[in-house]
Amino acid sequence: LQNTTVNVGKQGLTTPWTVAVDSDGNEQTGTGILALTTVGPVTFAGAYFNQTNLDTSAVDVNGTTTGTGFDGSTSIATIGVIGTAGPVTLDAWYLDMDDTFDSYTAGAKSTFDVSGIKLGADARFASLTTDAAGSKANTMGKLVLTADAGLVDGKIAYAMTDKDGGLTALDADASTTLLGWNLNALNKADADYWQA
C-alpha cells in the first residue's frame, strides 16, 4: 500500500500511554508489529505486541513503579487515528492489555505564531478501566499552554483526575498524564494539579 509503514520485531511502544525513547533508558519496548498508513491528512495506526518489558519498566495497575503488576508476555493491541485540521493535530487511541485493562484517549495539539511569539496548546482526556470485577474507570483531563518569545518562555498546565483514580498511563512521562519536577498526576484520585 502507498504511504504505509510496517515495523516488525522489537521496537519502542509508540503509544500515548508509554514512552518509546527515553534518554535515561526507561523506555517501554515490545516485540510485535506496528503499521501506519496515511490517507490525505489522516494517519491510521494499528499495533500488536505479544511480549513487552512492561514487567520492569512501567507503572503497574496498582500505581506502583515497576515490576509488580504486569506479565511481560501479556499481549497488547492498540489502534489510533491521527489527523490535522489547519494548525491543529487531533488524535484518538484505544489500547487493550489482555486480561488487564482497556483504555482510550483523545487529544488536540496546536502551535502558532502571534507577532513573533510561539504559542502552543495541548489538551488531552484519558480513561482506563482494569479488567477486575467491579472496576471503575480512572480518568484524567489536562490542558497545557505554552509561550516562547526568544530568550523568555513560559508554561502553565492543569490536570484533573476523577474520584475513582488517575491511573491513566504506563509511564509518568507518557502523554496520558501530566509530569512536573518530582510531581505528577498519575494514579492520584480526585486531584487538581497545577504547574507553572
Label every PLM stretch briefly.
Residues L1-V61, S75-T89, L145-D164:
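Outer membrane beta-barrel
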Residues G25-N26, V61-T66, D171-T176:
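Flexible, surface-exposed loop regions and adjacent strand-edge segments
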Residues T66-G67, G72-A77:
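Active-site glycine-rich loop that binds ribose-phosphate moieties when present
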Residues T18-V21, V61-T68, W181-A185:
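Extracellular loop and loop/strand-boundary signature of outer-membrane beta-barrel proteins
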Residues D71, G86-T89, Y94-A196:
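Outer-membrane beta-barrel pore domains
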